[in-house]
Amino acid sequence: MNIKIGTINFMGIRNVAFAVTLILTVIALGSWFTKGINFGLDFTGGTLIELTYEQPADLGKVRGQLVGAGYEDAVVQSFGDARDVLVRMPSEDPELGKKVATALQQADAGNPANLKRVEYVGPQVGEELRDQGGLGMLLALGGILLYVGFRFQWKFALGAILSLVHDAIIVMGVLSFFQVTFDLTVLAAVLAVVGYSLNDTIVIFDRVRENFRVLRKADLVENLNISTSQTLLRTIATSVSTLLAIAALLFFGGDNLFGFSIALFVGVMAGTYSSIYIANVVLIWLNLTSEDLIPPQAKDTVDDRP
């Protein structure tokens, strides 16, 4: 194999990358099965309390007041305008809304909280959301498998799916290890990671397919190195700009966007890695050749009639 000038030998360390991938995947799965996922109220059920303040509310201050009143599990979010606050708590107490409003009124008499509504989300609804979220993920992966298989070839499809599964496992493993609350926003982030990673993978796959036509004497490993190097600047620019935007959400978005930002941040890094060292390596394992990309020709029928 001849490495051209300007081409990085990405596949030269594929065995080391595979070992790293295996270790990280085992750690992620181990955390997943031992610590479990810290599901939020969207999936476990609980009480939703909407409060209205006379003046704009400081969410950090409200959260501190609730902790001081003994409600450590309360999740505080802005809702509507700056005076509306939504409090989520894992409790079935029908009097909880009044108790929370009273505690906040006593903590800050200058800007009292008025109870607007109280709703209880049962665990059955949460389980239904959880099942639908898992089903949505499976349907997304199935659709991707069909699309890539139709658009490219089944070997590409398998490489793409394995890389996406890896990304989802790594993200869920990190969320499990640090016990980040998994709610609907985090689920949306995981699905967004799947789409982002697939986009990276498709860009490289498209260049690999094109280079099979252009670089007829190059073997598969050389083709993968050249194709990845040719798309490297695009990959770096996209990943860095995306990570900078996510970092802004992570540091300035507050607690409400923390899980969402963490899932996206980890997912983008994992997706960039997997598009090179999982999706491409699968093509090597499956021994992709240029003949795999040539559509079968219809056999010519021979007229035996005299």
From Swiss-Prot:
Q: How does it sit in the membrane?
A: Multi-pass membrane protein
One MF term in the entry's GO annotations? protein-transporting ATPase activity
Annotated membrane-spanning segments are 17-37, 134-154, 158-178, 185-205, 232-254, 268-288
Its annotated function is as follows:
Part of the Sec protein translocase complex. Interacts with the SecYEG preprotein conducting channel. SecDF uses the proton motive force (PMF) to complete protein translocation after the ATP-dependent function of SecA.
GO CC annotations on file: plasma membrane
Q: Name one GO biological process term.
A: protein targeting
Main subcellular location of this protein, as a coarse class:
membrane
Q: Does the keyword Zinc apply?
A: no
Query: SUPFAM superfamilies this protein is in?
Result: Multidrug efflux transporter AcrB transmembrane domain
Q: Where in the cell is it found?
A: Cell inner membrane
Q: Which UniProt keywords apply?
A: Cell inner membrane, Cell membrane, Membrane, Protein transport, Translocation, Transmembrane, Transmembrane helix, Transport
Q: How does it assemble?
A: Forms a complex with SecD. Part of the essential Sec protein translocation apparatus which comprises SecA, SecYEG and auxiliary proteins SecDF-YajC and YidC.
Record organism:
Pseudomonas aeruginosa (strain ATCC 15692 / DSM 22644 / CIP 104116 / JCM 14847 / LMG 12228 / 1C / PRS 101 / PAO1)
- Pfam families per record: Sec_GG (PF07549), SecD_SecF_C (PF02355)
Protein family membership: Belongs to the SecD/SecF family. SecF subfamily.
The name of this protein is Protein translocase subunit SecF
